[in-house]
């Protein structure tokens, strides 16, 4: 499968990624394992998930497959933060505190100490854009 450079990061990702939005919700662990095995056998390496998918179950299922189907360092994991359904309603919170807490929970569910691409899932009108951007700016 053809790979492309991910920006200036030095990371190479396959042109086609494996989306896991239904994992843990409509797709059980066995079917998820089959999908992942097929994707890896086809040469794929880029796996997309998010904290909000299945209220974290997508990341949990993926975390259970890492190290079993593929070594962690052979895949590129992308996840997202900033949306939750904790109160039963969609809540967007891109504040520094919320994003860091989302990342910590994602890492725990994935069973890893890092993700390769971490994204803010959606715009938050209540949080100034500078807040999530400034916190990761290096001098």
Task: Identify the residue ranges that each predicted region occupies.
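N-terminal small/glycine-rich loop or linker at the start of catalytic domains
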Residues: 7-23, 78-91, 114, 119
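Glycine/proline-rich, positively charged
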Residues: 86-139
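Short, glycine/acidic-enriched loop or turn micro-motifs at the edges of active sites
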Residues: 51, 83, 124
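N-terminal binding-site loop/beta-alpha segment at the start of enzyme catalytic domains
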Residues: 1-76
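Acidic-residue sensor for enzyme active/binding pockets
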Residues: 59, 80, 130-131
